[in-house]
Amino acid sequence: MKTKLNELLEFPTPFTYKVMGQALPELVDQVVEVVQRHAPGDYSPTVKPSSKGNYHSVSITINATHIEQVETLYEELGNIDIVRMVL
């Protein structure tokens, strides 16, 4: 049985994205820029480097208002050239 994300969430709700990308200075700015387009606000993402330092993990939490917002952000964050994965 497959459960859909919108069946598990009650909106509005805090929703955290973890974005993994190349360890470049512009990664955080690009992530925040995309998030600001769909969920304007003040964000202070946390950044953790990988063990070898080649990648960074950026965690950012938004106040999601509907499932379409969540899905759109997954897609647009994944479309950033230096991003490798969005969880």
UniProtKB/Swiss-Prot annotation:
Signal peptide: none annotated. Coiled coil: none annotated. Gene3D superfamilies: 3.30.70.260. Belongs to the UPF0250 family. GO terms for cellular component: cytosol. This is UPF0250 protein CKO_02527. Pfam families: DUF493. The lineage of its organism: Bacteria, Pseudomonadati, Pseudomonadota, Gammaproteobacteria, Enterobacterales. Disulfide bonds: none annotated. NCBIfam families: PRK04998.1 (NF003447). HAMAP family: UPF0250 (MF_00659).
